[in-house]
Amino acid sequence: MDTAEIRSRFLNHFARRGHTIVPSASLVAQDPTLLLVNAGMVPFKPYFLGDLATPWPRATSVQKVVRTVDIENVGRTARHASFFQMCGNFSFGDYFKAEAIPFAFELLVDGFGFKPDDLWATVYLDDDEAEGIWRELLPAERIQRRGKEDNFWSMGVPGPCGPCSEIYFDRGAAYGREGGPIADEERYLEVWNLVFMQYERGEGAGYDYPILRELPARNIDTGMGLERMATILQGVDNLYEIDISRPVLDLAGQLTGRRYGADPADDVRLRVVADHSRTAAMLIADGVVPSNEGRGYVLRRLLRRAVRDARLLGAREPVMSELFGAIGTAMGPIYPELVDNAETITGVAVAEEASFAETLRTGTTIFDAAVRQVRSTGAATLGGDEAFKLHDTYGFPIDLTLEMAAEAGLSVDEAGFRRLMERQRQTAKADRAARRIGNVDLSAFRPILARSGATTFTGYEELSRESGVVGLVGIADGAGLTVVGEGDEVGVVLDATPFYAESGGQEPDFGLLRFDGGEVEVLDVQRPVPELVLHRVKVRSGELRLGDRVQAEVDENRRRAVSRSHTATHLVHAAFRRALGEGATQAGSLNSPGRLRFDFHALGAVPPSVLTDVEDEINEVALRDLPVRAFVTTQEEARRLGAMALFGEKYGDAVRVVDVGDYARELCGGTHVASSAQLGAVKLLSESSISAGTRRVEGLVGIDAFRYLAREHLLVSQLSTALKARPDELADRVTDIVGRLRDAERELDRLRAAAVLAGAGALAEGAEDVGGVAVVTAEVPAGTSPDDVRLLAMDVRGRLAGRPAVVAVVKADGSSIVVVTDSGARSAGLRAGELVRNSWASLGGKGGGKPDIAQGGGGNSEMIPAVFAKLRGLVAELASR
């Protein structure tokens, strides 16, 4: 049974049982706690949690999935792959265990032909209900109980979870010992996991996590790996050898000069090349590009592992382009984006392959030298400093170094590597302020500090003061200067300054330094070392000399706008802690003129109603005109007073506390308004996730908030006029319009499809007889959708029932072609995929597919006559054999 048939039987089985078939979502997870979709249920997570109303009570899908947590096992076992397709059926508070278990059993036995005697089931330790249901289907001795590690499912991050029941297939004594799944999971192969989604879990490593609550409804989430099922039903040893994977595996062998099956070690690498290249193609098709972080790093790692193994197998030329072509042929019929965007997808992979080839060439030389050095001393461990150099200088990911070292029989000092990485991060953090100023060597400030002492900050009390210039520093080289002139950009250190240096999430002050005969503009203010304030300035006029006296003037409007934002952030922090609990602590912030960004710890999205309540409370506090007071005290006293200290921040013995009346109290070194009424208004604009367990709120303060509200009011007025509705009727009116538009679009789609099919009868009647095969070739308008092109081709084929038939339909601009064949034509050796490759692809296009249907893209209108002629010739040649 081919993979397409397995897929079809699965979906149809559940469609007949009231499930809506839902297309696969993108691999790029919309869930902010995930980089990539790593389970079939991920697109349904909001429905399981009750965050969104469920469009259907039951659903079924075949979802694209990427998992790289076990990447080292890919190619080494029969069941590990980084990309797979997860068949699933889902119930959202509709049915539960009593239906889910028989649904699965019926499909396995009646749909896929499994013998009941070959099936085993496992249930969670205390799940008597599930075991009782299974006992109606299997004997008790083939039902086993297992613990949390095996039979309690979660995605590995906060979210839905629950006990599960797994179904196993006994492959026979040749594959291992008796005793069921508990004894041997190589012999007893898991084919289906039925998750009884009842709970929501919290943060925690491994299996040590809290259960937060029961979900609003008891749900079902099942997962049956399509490739694993194909492995069993096609009678092959592993999922790399099934119908959609074997062509890529064989091509990897051809490109590297190694025959699959000849050498076990080579086979592992060939499987890695085939697996990783397929996963990479699917990721790129969904918009992921290689990078050094996030999902881009996952892609880069996969591509680089594939390239390295291909080269170790003997490939001397790039391989990704050809591999991606084979992947498009194998997977394109199900995922047409692989064909439609083949050029872009392949281009990304080829560029990354070329880049890594140079990295690999240089880095491998350095690695080999390091290995020789270790062996010459009789040691067995590669130093952390060598691993760090490979990573930092040559772009070698640590996992690649670990893998290569293991192959060389060495271990790696990972702890030493991590220490050096942490030191680099700390150095980067400490030096960030200086880098903002320029490439200034921190040693440039030592003589200034020794000569003049620390900079005195007076900006809490004043916005203008006379100060002395105690340091001039070149931005480009950090050199000490004595005089600068018009147009120069330099760093200026004053003995005392009212300018606030960026820190604590507050942006720096801007302003002017005036002196006899000229002035300079202050563009940025940083603390490159704790004791000194460095002003990055541009000389507008005159010459500024070391030792000059200047009038330092802070831009008052900017300072007040930033101060409003900072005070508002304190209120936002306090309001969220009141609304969500003491755990909603600040994780970061940015206070700029009229705008704030506040990051805080929270397990899930903040409901809109809570955001509204928080905003209302903040504005009520502002209207109370509470005094804002700052004072310095000891850490111990500040704690006694209940002042909030920010996680991750370090404080000295003396700390500055900022109070907003009796509402908020925090340790803070920033600038603030004098009273809460000076905020004017606060408008929260958005709430989103920035990482697992961290949310972000952005908002406007003061005149910026008023302007936003005025624009919103004007927009509502304009919409009310345009839609002839009161403001409180707008939502219903827009919903109605959108609904009618959707209905009109559906009707338009129906009419368009009908128009396309209107000519199907005439095309069938005009079929040419080529060697006893009915051949139809047709052009349709360039604007015809790919779905309608396929629909027309299959409709014409249906009208030719009883005669061997080949139907080819191409868009007039040559952008795509679909070829279909019936069983009679296929019996005569006419396979759609080969016809596309030998006609369309041979003349400059790209494409391929299955024996019954294939498609191509990347052509042009000029090649259509030649394609049709070649197609007829191929039919004549093959039909005459």
Swiss-Prot record:
Zn(2+) binds at H566, H570, C668, H672. InterPro entries: aa-tRNA-synth_II/BPL/LPL, Ala-tRNA-lgiase_IIc, Ala-tRNA-ligase_IIc_anticod-bd, Ala-tRNA-synth_IIc_core, Ala-tRNA-synth_IIc_N, Ala-tRNA_ligase, Ala_tRNA_ligase_euk/bac, DHHA1_dom. It is found in: Cytoplasm. PROSITE patterns: AA_TRNA_LIGASE_II_ALA. Its EC number is 6.1.1.7. One of its GO terms (molecular function) is tRNA binding. Its cofactor is Zn(2+). GO terms for cellular component: cytosol. The keyword ATP-binding applies. Binds 1 zinc ion per subunit. Keywords: Aminoacyl-tRNA synthetase, ATP-binding, Cytoplasm, Ligase, Metal-binding, Nucleotide-binding, Protein biosynthesis, RNA-binding, tRNA-binding, Zinc. SMART domains: tRNA_SAD. Catalyzes the attachment of alanine to tRNA(Ala) in a two-step reaction: alanine is first activated by ATP to form Ala-AMP and then transferred to the acceptor end of tRNA(Ala). Also edits incorrectly charged Ser-tRNA(Ala) and Gly-tRNA(Ala) via its editing domain. Consists of three domains; the N-terminal catalytic domain, the editing domain and the C-terminal C-Ala domain. The editing domain removes incorrectly charged amino acids, while the C-Ala domain, along with tRNA(Ala), serves as a bridge to cooperatively bring together the editing and aminoacylation centers thus stimulating deacylation of misacylated tRNAs. Belongs to the class-II aminoacyl-tRNA synthetase family. This is Alanine--tRNA ligase.
